[in-house]
Amino acid sequence: MKKSRFIVGFIVAVVLGGGALLWGPTLLAEGDNVNMQLAKLNFILRTVRDNYVDVPDPSKLLEGAIRGMLEELDPHSVYIPPEDQKRINETFRGEFEGVGITFSIQNKWLTVVSPIPGTPADRLGIRAGDRIIKINNVSAYGITNDQVFEKLRGPKGTSVDVTIARPGINDPIDFTIVRDTIPIYSVAASFLMHDGQTGYVRINQFTATTDHEVEQALDSLRTQGMRRLLLDLRSNPGGYLDQAWKVADLFMPRKDMMLVYTKGRTARSNQEFYSTGRGAKYDFPVIVLINHGSASASEIVSGAIQDHDRGLVIGEVSFGKGLVQTPYPLPDGSAVRITTARYYTPSGRLIQRPYDKGIAEYIAEGYDDTGEEAPPDTTPREVYHTDHGRMVYGGGGISPDSTVKSPRGTATTARLLSQRLYFECAADYAAKHPELATNFERFLSGFQVPDEMLTELRALAKERKVQIVEDEWTKDLDFTKSNLKGELANVLFNDRNLYHAVRIESDAQVLTAITLFGQANQMAQ
């Protein structure tokens, strides 16, 4: 294999000619069988076009054929339509041009979940809970997510008029928002916990700026007195491979430590990535949190830390995605994302789960708890060893050093979450109690969700015809209170750090991790 310490071009390459080759003479020359199959596809397309009972859309037929072809490969080789690819590019580039809000559609109304700090919407005073009732003097009732993107995003320097209904204020408020470049942060939260020594960093996904964001967060936390780190990769679906190894690099104590390697059919698919030594300054104990939703790049980071005994991994078995995709853009703005390699952790583990039973079962198994109660050595998985000789396992995600399951909410909680009723209740309560926003420390330590707020949540659920089953409500009452307080903190203070600071107060996985820093400290020596 070729040793590389730099971003590998094939992972993020823009290969405009790659798509065209699928229809070029190189493919046709590979054998008569391919020619026959292409002729068959062409015949079927013409036959459907000329004889189907309704007039079909040929482009949709071809897109369906492309999807069907890729489904024969693996669950992660996919076709991406132009509009979806445009948004994916914006997300992973780390910025887009627009007004700067996160939003949801609630009861058919466009509702601001939070203005992104420092953006045009934030500077104008738009708040969480504001309901956008008009865009450019046209009603926004019944608007779809795609229409929101179309109307609110646009070139920097252009403007859009919005009319807002604000809880607690009778008359609508008009704003003219001048669009700007909006950053998309992959570090969702970074703060010093209440004990004054534990840093908490949560990464949502691995985009083009993640390693710089994490490094800035670590430097800032060290100046605040951080002596140990809780790295939260739960529900992080992954992202760029180069960002995964660069983040892992931040936690390695010296140069030339293997971080991850890839194997594929071509020479450029076979790569090794090693530490650069820049992580030597971050010599504090580390605990990584993972769950069933931690995949791909998240597993590269947690696998490297675990294999080198750099820290502990706590939580649930990760998803188990050990495949690397290369995007091949097409001329119309769409793309095909093809699996070109498998990746392996430093000890040699391939953590990809089998996917021969179909995509639906593959996804379901990734979130299944089956087998987690059994001791690891009773499972039929390949055994590998860390630098210090600890046993770790391949073929089914990253197994945590200590399993702590996250509570599985009831169906009642799932319904309340899906309708964003916790947020809506918090926004209404914040409008009635603005005095709560004067001091976060007082809010964090002193505020308890009152019965009044719980009553309002139940009334809201009844109004929206969301069923509450009484024994499920009782079972999840602590979660309900924690979520309401977290959403209230976000609305009052417009700071996602504060939302997470509230939520982790009662987080079983976080609380268990805190008790295990003694072990993590021994590893860091």
Predicted regions and their residues:
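Residue-level recognition of conserved beta-strand edge/terminus positions
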Residues: 135-136, 165, 339, 354, ...
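Conserved functional hotspot residues or short segments at active or partner-binding sites
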Residues: 350-351, 355-525
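Positively charged n-region of N-terminal signal peptides that target proteins for export
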Residues: 1-5
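Cleft-lining beta-strand/loop regions that shape enzyme active-site pockets
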Residues: 25-37, 41, 45-53, 57-58, ...
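Polar, glycine-rich mid-to-C-terminal structural blocks
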Residues: 297, 309, 316, 320-382
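Hydrophobic membrane-insertion alpha-helices, especially the h-region
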Residues: 8-23
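Extended, small/polar residue-biased N-terminal targeting/export presequences
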Residues: 52-113, 159-189, 256, 503-514, ...
